[in-house]
Amino acid sequence: MLGTALRRCAVAAASRAGSRGLLHPTPVPGPTAAIQSIRCYSHGSHETDEEFDARWVTYFNKPDIDAWELRKGMNTLVGYDLVPEPKIIDAALRACRRLNDFASAVRILEVVKDKAGPHKEIYPYVIQELRPTLNELGISTPEELGLDKV
């Protein structure tokens, strides 16, 4: 659709140029109509918070997830302007456990602390919500490992 609209704009510009050439096109009123037709690309459906959470939980709960997909998913998730919900982090930690990747599990907890930024109440809340999972999976927090003092 975008390619077709761009071709139409190029053809229209070439026909407006006429005998004066492309360097000195004849001004024609109304070129914004052609441009506006290609600027409708941001009108997609918007994802609710619940759908967002469900999408990421499903992603990390894939039984055949590999280490690269885990890192890619976490990298993408960290790129968003939010602190992931505890249920998303829970699914990511369980994926780490399935892969026997303790380092990634600790790194995920470090990233959550970093994403919380100056809001000091967020990270303790997330750890409190994840405590049963951390105990079940045998994952230590960065503070328990002494990494917060480095």
UniProtKB/Swiss-Prot annotation:
Gene3D superfamilies xrefs: Cytochrome c oxidase, subunit Va/VI
Placement of sequence motif SIFI-degron: 2-17
Biological process, per Gene Ontology: mitochondrial electron transport, cytochrome c to oxygen
Keyword annotations of the record: Acetylation, Heme, Iron, Membrane, Metal-binding, Mitochondrion, Mitochondrion inner membrane, Phosphoprotein, Transit peptide, Ubl conjugation
Annotated positions of the Phosphothreonine modification: T141
Membrane topology: Peripheral membrane protein
Presequence boundaries: 1-41
Residues found modified as N6-acetyllysine: K87, K113
Pathway involvement of the protein, from the record: Energy metabolism; oxidative phosphorylation
GO MF term set: metal ion binding
GO cellular component: mitochondrial inner membrane; respiratory chain complex IV
Localization per Swiss-Prot or TrEMBL: Mitochondrion inner membrane
Family statement drawn from the similarity comment of this UniProt entry: Belongs to the cytochrome c oxidase subunit 5A family.
Subunit architecture: Component of the cytochrome c oxidase (complex IV, CIV), a multisubunit enzyme composed of 14 subunits. The complex is composed of a catalytic core of 3 subunits MT-CO1, MT-CO2 and MT-CO3, encoded in the mitochondrial DNA, and 11 supernumerary subunits COX4I, COX5A, COX5B, COX6A, COX6B, COX6C, COX7A, COX7B, COX7C, COX8 and NDUFA4, which are encoded in the nuclear genome.
Function summary: Component of the cytochrome c oxidase, the last enzyme in the mitochondrial electron transport chain which drives oxidative phosphorylation. The respiratory chain contains 3 multisubunit complexes succinate dehydrogenase (complex II, CII), ubiquinol-cytochrome c oxidoreductase (cytochrome b-c1 complex, complex III, CIII) and cytochrome c oxidase (complex IV, CIV), that cooperate to transfer electrons derived from NADH and succinate to molecular oxygen, creating an electrochemical gradient over the inner membrane that drives transmembrane transport and the ATP synthase.
Name of the protein described by the UniProt record: Cytochrome c oxidase subunit 5A, mitochondrial
Naturally occurring in which organism (per UniProt): Otolemur crassicaudatus (Brown greater galago)
